[in-house]
C-alpha cells in the first residue's frame, strides 16, 4: 500500500477491506438501496475486470406519473475485442452518462493476428539460432496472454526444443489463479481444455515461484527484471 510501509497497519487495512468485499456475478442487477442498483459487465482487461452500470431512480414525472431513471456507466481499462482467454467486452445497451478511462484511447493497436505473426517470427528465429527471447511483461494479464499465444505457437508448429521461463514469482501466483478460474475463460480457451491442452501449464513451461529462484535465474541469464524468457534447448537436435 502506498500510504504506509508499516506491516501491522497494512495487515489491519487488508483485513478491513476483506470484510467489506462482496463478490458479484456478471450481468445481474444488484440492489444497493431503494434508488440505486448496479450491474457488472466484462471489461476484457484482465480476468475478473468489469465495468459498472448504475441505474439511479429519479423523481416521478408529473406528466406521465412514472419515475425517471438515469443510467451511468463507469469503467477503467477496457480490453481489445479478441484478447486471449477473455470474453470480449460488449457495449452497454444504454448510457446517459459515461465515465471512461482513456489513457490509450487515441492509439491504434496491432490486431491479434499480426501480433501472433510477429511473436512466431521472433521465437522461430531464436529456435533456429539457439538463442533466447526476453519479453518484459506485467505479472497479471499480459504474462498470461503471452503464455496462451506461445502455447498455441508451440502446438501448431510442433516445437518441442524450447523452454519458456516465467521469471517472476508474482506472475507465477497470478497464473495459478488464472488456472483456477477457468470458468471465466472465453469459449476458444475452453475448447482447448476439452481437447486436453493446457494453455497456462504446458510441458515446456517453467516458473520461478520464489524470490531466491528468481535471483538465481537472473544471475545465470546475466540480466535483471521480471518477465518471460523463451530459450532454445541446447540439448535437442531441432524442432520437428
Q: Which residues fall in each region the model found?
A:
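Acidic/His-rich, metal-assisted hydrolase cores and their charged scaffolds
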Residues: 1-71, 75-240
Amino acid at each position: 500500500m502506498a500510504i504506509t510501509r508499516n506491516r501491522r497497519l497494512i495487515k489491519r487495512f487488508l483485513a478491513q477491506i476483506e470484510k467489506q468485499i462482496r463478490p458479484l456475478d456478471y450481468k445481474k442487477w444488484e440492489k444497493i438501496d431503494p434508488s440505486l442498483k448496479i450491474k457488472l459487465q466484462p471489461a476484457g482487461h484482465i480476468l475478473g475486470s468489469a465495468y459498472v452500470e448504475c441505474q439511479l431512480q429519479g423523481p416521478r414525472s408529473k406528466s406521465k406519473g412514472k419515475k425517471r431513471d438515469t443510467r451511468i456507466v463507469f469503467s477503467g481499462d477496457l480490453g481489445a475485442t479478441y484478447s486471449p482467454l477473455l470474453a470480449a467486452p460488449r457495449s452497454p445497451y444504454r448510457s446517459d452518462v459515461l465515465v471512461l478511462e482513456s489513457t490509450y484511447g487515441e492509439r491504434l493497436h496491432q490486431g491479434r493476428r499480426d501480433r501472433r505473426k510477429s511473436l512466431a517470427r521472433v521465437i522461430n528465429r531464436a529456435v533456429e539460432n539457439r538463442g533466447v527471447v526476453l519479453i518484459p511483461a506485467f505479472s497479471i494479464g499480459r504474462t498470461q496472454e503471452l503464455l496462451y499465444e506461445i502455447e498455441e505457437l508451440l502446438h501448431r508448429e510442433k516445437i518441442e526444443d524450447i523452454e519458456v521461463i516465467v521469471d517472476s514469482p508474482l506472475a507465477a501466483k497470478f497464473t495459478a489463479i488464472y488456472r483456477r478460474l477457468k470458468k471465466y475463460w472465453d469459449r476458444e480457451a475452453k475448447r482447448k481444455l476439452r481437447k486436453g491442452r493446457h494453455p497456462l501449464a504446458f510441458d515446456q513451461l517453467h516458473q520461478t515461484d520464489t524470490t531466491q529462484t528468481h535471483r538465481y535465474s537472473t544471475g545465470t541469464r546475466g540480466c535483471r527484471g521480471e518477465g518471460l524468457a523463451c530459450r532454445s534447448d541446447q540439448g535437442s537436435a531441432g524442432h520437428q
